[in-house]
Amino acid sequence: MKITESVRTVISWSASIASQALSALTLLSIVFVGTSAPITEASPTQLTREQIAIIYMLLRDSGNSEEPSLPNTNAAADYYASNVQTQVVEAICLGCHVTNGFASSSDLIFSPGAENENLEAIRSYLQLRNDDGETLLTKVTGGLSHGGGVQLSVESDGYEALAELVSLLVAEDDSSGSTSENLFFKEVLLSDAKETLRRAALILAGRLPLESELTLAASSEEGLRLAVLGLMQGEGFHDFLIRSANDRLHTDAFVNGSFSEVSDLNGLAGDRYPMGETLWALEGAIWGYRTGIARAPLELIAYVIENDRPYSEVLTADYTMVNWFTSQVFRSGVEVGSFDDPKIFAPGQNRGSVAHDDQYFSESVPGFGTRVLEHSGFIEYPHAGVLNDLTWLHRYPTTETNRNRARARWTFYHFLGIDIETSAPRTTDPVALADTDNPTLKNPACTVCHDRLDPVAGAYQNYGNEGFYRDKWGGLDSLPDTYKYPEWFDIAEPTLYREGDTWFRDMKPPGIDNAVQPSDRVDDSLSWLAEQMVNDSRFAIAAVKFWWPALMGAKALVPPEVETDADYQARRNAYRAQELQISTLASRFRSNNLNARELLTDMILSPWFRAKAATPEASDRSVELADLGVDRLLTPEELDAKNEAILGYKWDKWEDDWLGNVKGFNTALHDRFRLYYGGIDSIGIKERNRQLTSLMANVAERQALSLACGVTALDFHDNETLSDRRLFTMVEASTTPLSEKALSVDVTTGAYRDRGTHDIDLPLSAGTKEFSIRFNNDAYDEGTENDRNLYIDAVEIYRDNQLVTVIEGEDFQNTTGFSQTIYGDGTAMGGVEYVDLDGLWTPVAWNLWGTGYVSFHVNVATAGNYRFRIVAWGSDYGDGIPANMTATVGATNAADQTVGSEAIKAQIQYFHQLMLGETVSRSDPEVEAVYELLLETWQERKMHTENSHAWSSPSEECLFPRDIHQSDWESGLGRDPEQMIYAWTSVMHYYLTHFDYLHE
C-alpha cells in the first residue's frame, strides 16, 4: 500500500514535534489497528476521515505550542492542473463522462476545457462516495463493473497522478470539516436519545424500551449506541430479521401457500431424499418439513446476525439451517427442537440427497410418493449460504432458455446492490431486436448487460430448474436435454455439448466481472462465487441497501433520470446525500468486520432515521427531505407487536398448533386483514404499502373499534391499584371531570345498630358541590332471599372540625340536586328504609338495593377544609363479603378546575407519551382537545338510560381476547357506574387511530 499524501502530511506534522514520545508511524498504528506495530507497505489499513481527524487532534494537543500546519488548500488545484486535467480527464474520461455521452447517467460528468469545473466534479464525486476515493480508483482499473472497462492500470502514470489527486482532495475535505451531508441536514431537527430509542425498540424488538435502557440512552451518544445494541436480541428482534429479510427475498411465498417442489416429500423432493419416507407415517410431519425448508434462508440470515458472525457468512456459510424435520431428512445429525415445534432452527448440513444414476432404483407407493430402494450414495452438498439454499433456488427458478439468469439477476440485486435490468437502456433498434445470432453473446445491444449477468448465471451451473443439485441423469450436470441432445426434440442445430460439460458453450464462462471461475471449482462454483462477492466493496453497500427499507420504511433512493422534471434537482440532492450516507455506513460496516448488528445500530443513529422535523428555513425542501426519519408507517406485523407492547394483547389473537403455521398463532392484523393493511404475501403482492390508503384507514378504524373498549375495561377490572395497571395509572373508573375526592370502602355488615362512619377530608372552594354515594356490589339469591344492600343513615358535613349540617338518609330525595339511578324501564333504584324502633316503623336511612347511585347538591358557603362523614351499614348476603360503596365529592360545573379534571388531563398527557411517544405539557392544546372529547362523550353518555355498563347490548358491543369468558363478565367486567369507562373508550379509540400511533 502506498502512503498517500495525507499520511505524508501527518508524518510531517509528527516529525516537526521532536519532543513527543511516540513516533508518527507508531501513532498511526495505534489509531488504525490498535497496536504499536509500525505500519508497513503491506498493511491493509486504509486512511479514513475520522482517523486523520483523530491524528490531527492528538498531534495538536500533544504539548507542542505550535499548531501544526494544515494541508495547502491550493495544492490539489495546482496538482490537478499540472498532472490530471490533460493527461487523464481530457485524454481518457471525456470520451464517455460528458453530457449525452455513454456515461451521462453517472455521477461524474466533465466538460471540455473546464479545468476548475472538472476538479470540482471530482471533489463532489469523492464526497458523494465518501470512501477516500476507493470507488473512483477501482473503476478506472475496470473494477466495480465499470462500463468503460479498464482505462488505467495501477502501474501507469495516469493512475499514480489520479491517486495523488484523490489524496490531496481527501486531505482538504478533512481539514475543512465540511461535508455535503452536513449541509444536507443543516435545517433538519433530530430526535433526542429517548425518542430514538423508543422508535428503535418498537421496530427492532417489538416492545417499549425499559427505564434502564432509556437512562443509558440519555447518558451519552455511546450510551445510546449501547442501548440500541441491547435491543437486538430475543424473539422480537428475531421476528424483525425474518420479516425484513423476507421483504427482500420473498421466500415466505412457500409459507403462504405457493407450492414448493423442493419440499414436496410426496413428489420431487421424496424422489431425491430417501429419508423423507420416515416422515410419511407421522401425522402433520410433512408440514413441519415444509416449514423447515421454506424458512431456512431467512433463519440463516437471522442466525448470522444474532450470533455476531460476519455478514459475509450469509453467502459463504458451509451449512444451512435445519429444524427437527429437515435434520432427519438431510441426515444432518443435529439435535434441534422437537416434532411439536418446527420453529426452532440450528445450523446443519444437507447430507441427505442422492443422484439419479445407474444405481438408483425406486418404487411408487400409492398415497405417499416415491420410495428410494437403492442409490449410489449421498451427495456431499457444497453449501454456499443462501445462494444454494433449496428455497432460494426454487423461489428464483430457471428454465431451459433462461439459463439461471433470473438467479443471477437477483444475486446481483440483493447482494451487490446492482439492478441489472436498469443498468443500461434497453435498445429499441428493430435490427438489434431481430438478431438471432446468439445476441446475448455477440450483439452489443444485449452484451451491455449480459456480459455482466451471464458469468454469474454460469456460477449456478450445478442447479436445475427446481433447484436440485445436478439433477440430470447420472448426477453429472444440470444441463437440459434440449441443449445436450437436440436431435431428441427434432431440433436441427447440432449440439455444442461435450461429455463432462457442466455449462453452456454458447454463453460466457462462469465467473464474475473480470474473474473466471477456476477449473478446480466447478463442483462448488457457487461457493467460489460467494467468496468473490463478499470481498467486493459492493457487498457492504448492498447490505446497507438490503436493510434500509426495514428501518427507514422506504427503499434506497435511485437517481432521477429526467433533468427537465420540476423536482429533478431536489431528488438529485436527496439521492446524493443518501448515497453519501450509505457509503459511510458501508465503510464502517467493513471496518466492523461486517457485524450486522453494528450496521443496524449505525443506521439507527444516522440522521436518516433520527430526523423528526424541518426548520422553517427548509420550507422549500419538501421533496429533498421526503424520505427522512419519522412518520414511517408500521407494517401489520409491527402494529400487532406495538399493540401487544402497549395494550397488552394483539387484535383477535388465537393459538394455532398446526405445524404449517410458522408463527404458532393467528391475529386479525397478521392474517385476515394483512393484505388489506398494506402487507405482503410474497406471491402476488411483494411490495408493502408505505402510505396509508383509504382501505387501510378502514382497517385501522376497525382495529380501534375492536380494541378500545376491551383494553379499557380490562385494565380497570383486572388491576385494583394504579401501580398495577398498564394504561390507566392516574385515574380510577370513578374519577370524573367533576371529581374532587372519592372514597371506596367496605361498610359494616349487620343492622341499623351496627352502622359505622367513614370520612372524606378535602379542601373546598365556596360554591355548589355534588355529593354522591354509589353501591358497587349488589347481590340477591332468589332461593334463600339473601340480599346484600347498602344503607345510608346520614351524611354529616364539617368545616374545620365544626359540624355545619347533617343530611339524613331519609331526606335525600328532598335535598337540592337529588338524583338517583333510573333503570331502563323507568323505575328508580333506591328509597327510604324503615326500621322498627320501639315498635314503630321509623324512616331512618336511604336504601340502595341495587348497583347504582344516589346524589345531591351541597352548598359550601365559605372555602375551607371539609369533612364528609357517611354513616352507613350493609345487609348480609351470606358469602362473607361486605357491601362496598364509593362516596364522591365533586363540582357541578364542568368548567371548574377539579382534582378529577387535573387527574384526567395528567392521564391524557401520559397517553401522549405512552402511545404516541410525544412529550407534551398538561396545558398543551392537544391535551385540551382530547379532554374536551372525553368530557363531551361523558356528558352525552350520562343522558342515556342504559348506561350502567361500558356497552349496552345489543346496540353496542365490547370485544375482548378469546380467553376472556362469560364468568369474567359476571364478575363485574365492564361495569361503568360513572360512565367513565365508556368515555375513556372514546379516548382510546382516538389514540388507536392517531397518525402517530400507526406510524413510527
Identify the residue ranges that each predicted region occupies.
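N-terminal export/targeting leaders of redox proteins
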Residues: 2-78, 198, 315, 333-334, ...
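Aromatic- and Gly/Pro-enriched helix-to-coil junctions and flexible linker segments
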Residues: 38-238, 242-251, 328, 491-538, ...
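Extracellular structured ligand-interaction cores
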Residues: 83, 90-93, 105-107, 131-133, ...
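Short catalytic/ligand-binding loop motif for oxyanion handling, primarily in non-cytosolic enzymes
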Residues: 101-106, 254, 455-457, 608, ...
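Substrate-binding/catalytic groove segments of enzymes
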Residues: 143-149, 421-422, 557-558, 922, ...
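His/Asp/Glu-rich metal/cofactor-coordinating catalytic motifs and the adjacent surface-exposed loops
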Residues: 177-179, 188-204, 208-209, 224, ...
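Generic long, charged, amphipathic alpha-helical segments
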Residues: 558-569
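Extracytoplasmic
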Residues: 738-893
